[in-house]
């Protein structure tokens, strides 16, 4: 959650049973940073970190989490960028476990800059983008996508991410007009790819968490339900 999930926020999550905590999304290149500034001007939360300071900033945030002695999980960072270069650069942070390509955020400013959801418009471009990150970084790679975007074939996108060699596909199974996830998207993707699926959207209790896993996700992610620094159910019971 941009402007929210920094190291201090993630530290609140370290004792709740998560095996992965994700920082970001951070605006990683000049196009994304410029878009982020426009978003801030209209009153939305964003991380505002200069490109030349981002490596040091994320390093500090990752170390803050890893220094929690009771936390033995991994740390990921979600990055918005119109090109792979800065994502590859951030992947060099020694303490970081996973870089996540943001093909998910739908703010108009980001889409116009070629970031976030804009990457879903052409599966070949997304595959090439992801392949370059996979090829040139030595960390695990995740790609976060948004489901049910007009004109986008979710299965084709998942196949592109899979073919690119990513380790994870993180699916926001958004169901427009409904206050629940579109579990059928997870089912369709599961039938077509072998990649590790992280299911996201409206996971707020044991029922929704179990439904996501039953639909074919290998793991779940929680965002808004954790906004107060805790979660409303016991992860060990999922």
Over which residues does each language-model region extend?
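Well-ordered, non-transmembrane segments within structured domains
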Residues: 73-112, 125, 151-162
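Histidine/lysine/aspartate-rich catalytic loop segments that bind and position anionic ligands
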Residues: 139-142, 146-175
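Active-site-adjacent beta->alpha loops and helix N-cap segments on the catalytic face
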Residues: 32-37, 56-62, 84-86, 105-138, ...
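Glycine-rich phosphate-binding active-site loops on the catalytic face of alpha/beta enzymes
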Residues: 21-31, 98-110, 164-178, 215-236
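N-terminal capping/small domains of soluble enzymes
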Residues: 1-85
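Helix C-cap/helix->beta junction micro-motif
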Residues: 71, 136-137, 164-165, 193
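Catalytic cores of alpha/beta
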Residues: 6-15, 84-95, 149-163, 191-193, ...
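Hydrophobic faces of well-ordered beta-strands that scaffold small-molecule active sites
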Residues: 1, 19-24, 73-79, 99-101, ...
